[in-house]
Regions:
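Conserved PLP-enzyme active-site core in the AAT-like
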Residues: 4-222
Length: 223
């Protein structure tokens, strides 16, 4: 059967999927976009947020630092790593780093932190608690740093017995996150959920630039 519909993610299947995701997140105000895989999603979101002189704060064990073949650095952005023993970074670590950067006499010669990246679960399988994520997001907001949650395996994190967070709570405790499909049973596809109004404008342009707008985008929507 031949189906005639709009391309590039503007079809009825993608629109229906967007509405289902907004409902599940209890976030009717969210913008939802579909990309193919995790590395493409991470590079696209990070490129959309950072200015040319900025970098992204991550745990030293973070996925973007260890397992994406330098994808972020290849776009000209530094991954600013913080030490960790359990895969997580803390609100205090972010505060300490930003304060150090702002107060260093050579601050304008050092890559400026422009956002914070975490994954849930972390690269080692640990989970952020609601209290930890709340504290981290409060600190990010205080310093004007968008918080991005890599949710490639978010489904596993939310369903883990020790998890104390829901999908709507995740949505309220970050600026942008994605719901992974590829790593949790879908053929392919990740759903980017943008909560911060300031990050919504022109996102589809950066998607196109990064090769993320599929002509047959409905294949993502049906996942």
């Amino acid at each position: 059967m031949c189906i005639r519909d709009r391309g590039y993610g503007e079809d009825e299947y993608c629109e229906a999927a967007r509405e289902k995701i907004k409902t599940a997140c209890q976030a009717p105000e969210a913008d939802v976009h579909f990309l193919v895989g995790g590395t493409q999603t991470n590079t696209t979101v990070i490129a959309a947020i950072l200015r040319p002189w900025q970098g992204v704060i991550s745990a030293v064990s973070g996925h973007i630092n260890c397992h994406e073949a330098g994808a972020i650095e290849s776009t000209g952005h530094k991954v600013i790593t913080l030490p960790t023993t359990n895969g997580k970074i803390t609100a205090q670590q972010v505060q300490d780093y930003v304060e150090w950067h702002r107060n260093d006499e050579s601050t304008e010669h050092i890559v400026q932190p422009g956002m914070v990246y975490i994954s849930h679960p972390t690269e080692g399988g640990t989970l952020y608690t609601k209290a930890e994520l709340t504290a981290l997001y409060d600190t990010c907001r205080r310093y004007g740093l968008p918080l991005f949650i890599d949710g490639a395996r978010l489904g596993y994190g939310l369903m883990a017995e020790e998890s104390d967070m829901t999908l709507p709570e995740i949505a309220r405790l970050c600026d942008v996150f994605y719901i992974g499909g590829t790593k949790v049973g879908a053929l392919f596809g990740e759903a980017v959920v943008i909560m911060n109004e300031n990050l919504k404008k022109d996102f589809r342009f950066i998607m196109k630039q990064r090769g993320g707008r599929m002509a047959k985008g409905r294949l993502l929507g049906v996942q």
